[in-house]
UniProtKB/Swiss-Prot annotation:
Record protein name field: Zinc finger transcription factor Trps1
Extent of Low complexity compositional bias: 1050-1059
Subunit comment: Interacts with RNF4; regulates TRPS1 repressor activity. Interacts specifically with the activator form of GLI3 (GLI3A) but not with the repressor form (GLI3R).
Ranges annotated as biased composition (Polar residues): 21-31, 40-49, 166-189, 862-871, 961-977, 1040-1049
Gene: Trps1
């Protein structure tokens, strides 16, 4: 249906044709591949006409219908050419891959083909006739166009082994291609390095995407093969997104990469489908074939249908057809040799059937239908090619010959190549196209020598039996690609390339393994000038030093090491070089996050040839498993690891690591991103690849917890090791090794800073901070990160304590805010930090970014005080930190402390250090008062900022409020013990830091302080919640000791420095809100207000209330005590405010309070002086809330204040609201609050007489000023008369 255009990975295509085809080459490749695969697998097309019909039907249906006639292999080239447009052959027999519409010639496809393949391609190129795998001969050759495309694919894929070969004989190419096609497809992908390919593919695919057929709506289980994430549904989109984000490190923004998505789906389905016992083989064939085919023929996935090849003993025995109606599961399995078909999800039955019914096929398949089976083995590879080009082409599967080794072991196949118009490249009519039966190696040659030589070197130790696929699986990725390169013999050592492929990422050009007993191989690093040459035997390669160099110096995991035999540094793109980029050391394990992309883009082979052994350069130890080799180094030669590093460095030049870092050329190992600025590369990793790297070494971690643990265990103990690069050698490596298991996110990709130990210039820090903020906003936070933070937070202090020997400077990460800037700097600079917003919390060194940006003085005193504080105030630090993070994390659970919204274009801090949305922050900034909730309007969740609808309080109130704020600020600093403003008053930090530990709240308050000198190490969300809790204790909390309520015992008595009550315009809040504790997050969110309404602290500083104000209130709201005696009473029996609701009538005035009395008429303050709860007029509280509290006149209420402090003069309960259960430490506050209660009921509003249902409703009503008569409500500020 949709043609996948693969980037011309390797247009080895013939000069002329290759060039023409190149554009199409990708397309043709893809189509060819798809075709080949489908052709192979689905060769069972009935009459071409029938098939064509089926195809068109299937295309329309998007479900690959089972080929109506699987048996018809008759499709001949002629038929194919006729049906050039015919897309889908019945998949029945051969179709190991889905008979995808990919073969179909769609207008799209035609266009694509036409342009590239000259006329031939345009021809019914796409008639993918899948000759049955059984009869390669039957594989009808598709029109020359197809062959050309196929050829191109082959050329490209085989690295155009002999560029000529594939192109020259369309048929031959098709045939040859079939085997190669898969490989080539895979190689192409690998060459991109996976990522690159995926992108181009995505781009190409974007065009193709139109066809994607809707996936089946049926419900099914979707499960991630790597981490087990799963869900039950009918849409794989979430699974794709999950895989892209968490395993490929890709942002979901690149959704246009449909091909990649298809591959991802295929990969998961593949895992489910690959049941064959020869799973590795299958895996290889399936993954390489199916995934690639699928990827190449994305339509199949989109179509919702594709086939999984089932192999047994290396013999292709049938297909598992997956259709949209059973998405995620194989619908049925079908024998390739007969019509045996059954529904199910396991190929076991098919394998048993094959062994019982077609035992003769086991051996025969290799030699007799060698063409078919090898191609089958190649799975998808060879068969698709079978669609030999036009019937006119000489090369046909019928012409296919088996090439045997001296022992009569089938080594591969050849097809005579006749020059095609389009494929004239190397073509001499005498040339034949050869392809290896065990891997993707293919070449064009006049003799079979190259193939035999390849066989001897790559498969000599292995029997030709079909079982080799495993080896093939291993070799193919690298070796196949390299082999193709070999075929191209672009470099003089074609044979070495397979090795390179295997060991190749190293870029060693080794002479062919088998060729010499001893050979000297040159190894060089892709990222720097590190090089070395080693003499070794034909069966081993010495890649240990290079691997260790990559891991230690470049922090590159072995699975991500790329190799291109044709490019000095292996960083080339297949479009530019004939060689394929391979990942010779990739483990390609399904659970390896580093290989997740590779599995999608590379031919799924096994990493490295089993025959190639990796020799230890320090002893005689050798092993085919790179992981084992690395482990060997770590365990046996750990002490020498540094030598290797040094060697690398020497090779690099004396520059060594510095050459890499100092040169400032930082390249991403996951993609082609290169930059001179370390911060940028760090940001790139963080945003694009979601990985965290240790700044001290090459260790990378998937999460911050792991990173912290690593730091604690490795660097805190090895403080003496200060080398920037792989200093830890063994430590780093083991972790790296395990990283694939741990790290779902993806790769460790940074060169450790050579300067890790050095302090980073502040300018950098500042800039980086800004960058970080951006990064954080951009970054999608996962809950795990917060969990990590939580886990890590508490350890920060320990880390600091545990690494005393590190000088702050040397420990870039841990500089405890020596100057907050330095700290930030170092943290930021460290890739870890960059990568993760993590570093700070992790190391417990978080410094308020804001503070730094503003340029906190970096006085040594400050640092000293901080360092001392650290152990004690780790929490406050984390908290600070978490909050600063909060501010910058969107959608991370942060909510506005004022309006509770979680959506905002920008997080701001209010005067109290709490996080507020842009709207509330701007409002407060402009009006110096919290944004009233009643004016908050939202548009699509985003708050709209508009003018206040209510009149502002009288100017006096505003001034008072401002004064309050000022005092509050200073008070907070004092209260917090930690300088409220580190920026402005560093000296405070010295004096108070030690105070911080005192009250539990102090830490938080300190945090709350604008600057938050130290960032608490608590998780962001938790920190905010804590802030809220700390700032406001739950409603039901009874009077707490002053210390508890305020950071400073001294201040506790009075509203913590009288942080004025009027943070918000709502009345009740003013009484209920603990005077702004420094960390007091904005005037709390609505709920917050009721939930933690009262601090045990008086909410209004008595000192701040001017007597005049009180008199005014008093005159306004004169409380008729007789009518409301209960206001003054306290209910002694109710210890818990929650429980203290007593039916209104039951409240009695305590005997010592007379319901009636001159006191009732006395102004509030006077009443208070009389030790009375001071009945205030019902509206007084409201008014007071609005203005007086803010008015800071310190005269009248001093008495109250002292009284409050002493508290001995009055019963505690006397200041407890019997209705709301709120306990006031301040009588005035109590009186004001009580004045809000009306006479008719416990929850009647005295201002508008509205009867509220309960205390919460009442609180909300008062707070928001929801008075029935708005005019009256506005008047509330004025004497109510």
């Amino acid at each position: 249906m949709v043609r996948k255009k693969h980037p011309p990975l390797r247009n080895v295509a013939s000069e002329g044709e290759g060039q023409t085809l190149e554009p199409t080459a990708t397309e043709s490749k893809v189509s060819g591949k798809n075709k080949e695969l489908s052709a192979d697998q689905m060769s069972e097309n009935t009459d071409q006409s029938d098939v064509a019909e089926l195809n068109s039907k299937e295309e329309h249906s998007t479900h690959g219908q089972e080929p109506s006639s699987s048996g018809k292999k008759d499709l001949q080239i002629s038929g194919l050419s006729e049906k050039a447009g015919f897309n889908y052959e019945s998949p029945s027999k051969g179709g190991s891959l889905v008979s995808f519409p990919h073969d179909e010639v769609t207008d799209r496809n035609m266009l694509a083909f036409s342009s590239p393949a000259a006329g031939g391609v345009c021809e019914p190129l796409k008639s993918p006739q899948r000759a049955e795998a059984d009869d390669p001969q039957d594989m009808a050759c598709t029109p020359s166009g197809d062959s050309l495309e196929t050829k191109e694919e082959h050329k490209m894929s085989p690295k155009a082994t002999e560029e000529t070969g594939p192109v020259q004989s369309g048929q031959a190419n098709c045939q040859g291609l079939s085997p190669v096609s898969v490989a080539s497809k895979n190689p192409q992908v690998p060459s991109d390095g996976g990522v690159r390919l995926s992108k181009p593919k995505g781009d190409l695919l974007v065009n193709d995407n139109p066809d994607p057929a809707p996936l089946s709506p049926e419900l099914q289980d979707f499960k991630c093969n790597i981490c087990g994430y799963g869900y039950y549904g009918n849409d794989p989109t979430d699974l794709i997104k999950h895989f892209r984000k968490y395993h490929l490190g890709l942002h979901n923004r690149t959704r246009q990469d449909a091909e990649l998505d298809s591959k991802i789906l295929a990969l998961h389905n593949m895992v489910q489908f690959s049941h064959s016992k020869d799973f590795q083989k299958v895996n290889r064939s399936v993954l390489s074939g199916v995934l690639q085919d699928i990827s190449s023929s994305r339509p199949a996935l989109l179509n919702g249908t594709y086939d999984v090849q089932v192999t047994s003993g290396g013999t292709f025995i049938g297909i598992g057809r997956k259709t949209p109606d059973c998405q995620g599961n194989t619908k049925y399995f079908r024998c390739k040799f007969c019509n045996f078909t059954y529904m199910g999800n396991s190929s076991t039955e098919l394998e048993q059937h094959f062994l019982q019914t077609h035992p003769n096929k086991i051996k025969v398949s290799l030699p007799s239908s060698e063409g078919v089976k090898p191609s089958e083995k190649n799975s998808n590879k060879s068969i698709p090619a079978l669609r030999a080009s036009d019937s006119g082409d000489v090369g046909k599967w019928q012409d296919k010959m088996t090439v045997k080794a001296g022992d009569d072991t089938p080594v591969g196949y050849s097809v005579p190549i006749k020059p095609l118009d389009s494929s004239r490249q190397n073509g001499t009519e005498a040339t034949s196209y050869y392809w290896c039966k065990f891997c993707s190696f293919s070449c064009e040659s006049s003799s079979s020598l190259k193939l035999l030589e390849h066989y001897g070197k790559q498969h000599g130790a292995v029997q030709s039996g079909g079982l080799n696929p495993e080896l093939n699986d291993k070799l193919p990725r690298g070796s196949v690609i390299n082999q193709n390169d070999l075929a191209k013999s672009v470099e003089g050592e074609p044979l070495t390339k397979p090795e390179k492929g295997l060991s190749g990422a190293k870029k060693k050009d080794f002479p062919s393994k088998g060729a010499e007993d001893n050979m000297v191989t040159s190894y060089n690093c892709q990222f720097c000038d590190f090089r070395y040459s080693k003499s070794h035997g034909p069966d081993v390669i010495v890649v240990g030093p290079l691997l260790r160099h990559y891991q230690q110096l470049h922090n590159i995991h072995k699975c991500t090491i790329k190799h291109c035999p044709f490019c000095p540094r292996g960083l080339c793109s297949p479009e530019k070089h004939l060689g394929e980029i391979t990942y010779p050391f990739a483990c390609r394990k399904s659970n390896c996050s580093h290989c997740a992309l590779l599995l999608l883009h590379l031919s799924p082979g096994v990493a490295g040839s089993s025959r190639v052994k990796h020799q230890c350069h320090q002893c005689s130890f050798s092993t085919p498993d790179v992981d084992v080799l690395l482990f060997h180094y770590e365990t046996v030669h750990e002490s020498q690891a540094s030598d290797v590093k040094q060697e690398a460095n020497h090779l690099l030049g004396s520059d060594g690591q510095q050459a890499v870092r100092d040169s400032k050329e930082h390249s991403c190992t996951k993609c082609d991103f290169i930059t001179q600025v370390e911060e940028e590369i760090s940001r790139h990793y963080r945003r694009a690849h979601s990985c965290y790297k240790c700044r001290q070494c090459s260790f990378t971690a998937a999460d911050t917890q792991s990173l912290l643990e690593h730091f604690n265990t490795v660097h805190c103990q090895e403080q003496e090791i200060t080398t920037a690069n792989g200093e830890e050698g063994g430590h780093a490596i083991p972790t790296i090794k395990e990283e694939p298991k741990i790290d779902l996110k993806v790769y460790s990709l940074l060169n450790p800073d050579s300067k890790m130990g050095e302090t980073v210039p502040e300018s950098i820090v500042k800039r980086e901070k800004l960058d970080d903020k951006e990064g954080l906003k951009d970054k999608i936070w996962t809950e795990s990160s917060t969990d990590d933070l939580r886990g890590v937070a508490w350890r920060g202090a320990d880390i600091l304590r545990g690494s005393p020997s590190y000088t702050q400077a040397s420990l870039g990460l841990l500089t405890p805010v020596s100057s907050s800037q330095e700290q930030t700097k170092t943290l930021r600079d460290s890739p870890n930090v960059e990568a993760a917003h993590l570093a700070r919390p992790m190391y417990g060194l978080a410094v308020d970014t804001k503070g730094f940006l503003q340029g906190a003085p970096a006085g040594s005193e400050k640092s000293a005080s901080l360092t001392q504080q650290y152990p004690a105030s780790g929490e406050s630090k984390t908290k600070d930190e978490s909050q600063s993070l909060l501010r910058r994390r969107r959608g991370s659970g942060v909510f506005c402390a004022n309006c509770l919204t979680t959506k905002t274009s920008l997080w701001r801090k209010n005067a109290n250090g709490g996080y507020v949305c842009n709207a509330c922050g701007l409002y407060q900034k402009l009006h110096s008062t919290p944004r009233p909730l009643n004016i908050i309007k939202q548009n699509n969740g985003e708050q709209i900022i508009r003018r206040r609808t209510r009149k502002r309080l009288n100017p006096e109130a505003l001034q008072a409020e401002q004064l309050n704020k000022q005092q509050r600020g200073s008070g907070e600093e004092q209260v917090n013990g930690s300088p409220l403003e580190r920026r402005s008053e560093d000296h405070l930090s010295e004096s108070h830091p030690r105070e911080i530990p005192l009250p539990s709240l102090s830490k938080y308050e300190a945090q709350g302080s604008l600057t938050k000198s130290h960032s608490a190490q608590q998780p962001v969300l938790v920190s905010q919640a804590l802030d809220i809790h700390k700032r406001m204790q739950p409603l039901h909390i009874q009077i707490k000791s002053p210390q508890e309520s305020t950071g400073d015992p001294g201040n506790s008595s009075s509203v913590s420095d009288g942080k004025g009550s009027s943070e918000r315009g709502s009345p009740i809040e003013k009484y209920m809100r603990p005077a702004k504790h420094p960390n007091y997050s904005p005037p709390g969110s609505p709920i917050e207000k009721y939930q933690y309404p009262l601090f045990g602290v008086p909410f209004v500083h008595n000192d701040f209330q001017s007597e005049a104000d009180w008199l005014r209130f008093w005159s306004k709201y004169k409380l008729s005590v007789p009518g409301n005696p209960h206001y003054l009473s306290h209910v002694p029996g109710l210890p818990n405010p929650c429980q203290n609701y007593v039916p209104y009538p039951t409240f009695n005035l305590p005997p010592h309070f007379s319901a009636v009395g001159s006191d009732n008429d006395i102004p509030l303050d006077l009443a208070i002086k009389h030790s009375r709860p001071g009945p205030t007029a019902n509206g007084a509280s409201k008014e007071k809330t609005k203005a007086p509290p803010t008015v800071k006149n310190e005269d009248p209420l001093n008495v109250v204040k002292t009284e409050k402090v002493d508290r001995s003069t009055q019963d505690e309960l006397s200041t407890k609201c019997v209705h709301c259960g709120i306990v006031f430490l301040d009588e005035v506050m109590y009186a004001l609050h009580m004045s809000c209660h009306g006479d008719s009921g416990p929850f009647q509003c005295s201002i508008c007489q509205h009867l509220c249902t309960d205390k919460y409703d009442f609180t909300t009503h008062i707070q928001r000023g929801l008075h029935r008569n708005n005019a009256q409500a506005e008047k509330n500020g004025k004497p109510k008369e």
